[in-house]
A protein has these predicted regions:
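Short acidic, low-complexity intrinsically disordered linear motifs used
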Residues: 1-12
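Catalytic core of pol beta-like nucleotidyltransferases
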Residues: 12-80, 87-254
Length: 254
């Protein structure tokens, strides 16, 4: 019985791979037959975006409010979020773009933690993006479909790509990382020194995050590294890393 349970548990960790297969159509809860966004949803998303940005109280006009991510593509699934990007020119806020990025990232994190907005059963995740970064992400293939909420038209229409995920390769590479994450959890429980644990954690995180970034640059959203990142996020292993980091930090002061 225990063996069967373990086999089922292991299999369940890879179940999100099934969500990587492309759909034959866009999600019709959101999109009309002519692939324009449902008007009520468009108005709701604009309001959310404007309310968020107004709360930032920073200089700089909104260039656009973009709907992007898997719900604007054929790879949508039960794990999808409504990715809502407020597009601005960072230079209009401050010439120090790194400072602006840190500020809006923090504001995004606070907003997403404080709000639990769902539309058609999907969570709304808000972010602020520089106009030039959006253009670079689109031209570089790092983003699929992108829809302008302000103009009510596609900035980039999604394409029906001929893609099949390599399940065996995803499992193999993800398993290696998952074992390392399990090792981090074991090290924390056994009392490994904080600095040593953080060094190992940073190496694991660099492999995951750095791999994803290089994969997106090289092959776009269907790269094996990006799919591994999505699997680890969907099966809870990204959260495990965050939990170890938080618990290890807190434990220093006990």
């Amino acid at each position: 019985m225990l063996k069967k349970f373990n086999e089922y548990f292991i299999q369940a960790q890879f179940e999100p791979i099934k969500s990587f297969y492309l759909k034959g159509d866009l999600n019709r809860k959101f999109w009309n037959d002519d692939d324009t966004l449902d008007e009520e949803i468009r108005e709701q998303l604009i309001r959310i975006g404007e309310d968020f940005y107004e709360g930032l109280e920073i200089e700089g006009e909104i260039v656009d409010i973009a709907f992007c991510g898997s719900l604007c593509n054929y790879n949508w699934s039960e794990y999808s979020d409504i990715d809502l990007h407020i597009i601005i020119n960072f230079d209009d806020v401050n010439k120090d773009q790194e400072l602006v990025e840190k500020m809006v990232d923090y504001a995004k994190k606070v907003w997403n933690e404080q709000h639990n907005i769902q539309i058609k059963g999907f969570d709304v995740e808000i972010a602020v993006q520089d106009e030039d970064d959006l253009k670079d992400s689109i031209s570089g293939g790092r983003m699929g479909g992108v829809y302008s909420l302000l103009s009510g038209d596609w900035i980039k229409k999604p394409s029906k790509d001929d893609f099949t995920p390599d399940e065996d390769l995803i499992r193999k590479k993800a398993t290696t990382i998952m074992k390392k994450v399990k090792g981090l959890e074991d090290d924390f429980k056994s009392g490994v020194e904080y600095d040593d644990l953080m060094d190992d954690l940073k190496k694991v995180w660099k492999k995951i995050k750095g791999g994803r970034e290089s994969g997106l640059e090289r092959e776009g959203e269907y790269s094996i590294e990006n799919l591994i990142f999505k699997l680890l996020r969907r099966n809870g292993y990204i959260q495990k890393i965050m939990d170890v980091r938080r618990k290890a930090y807190d434990k220093q002061f006990k």
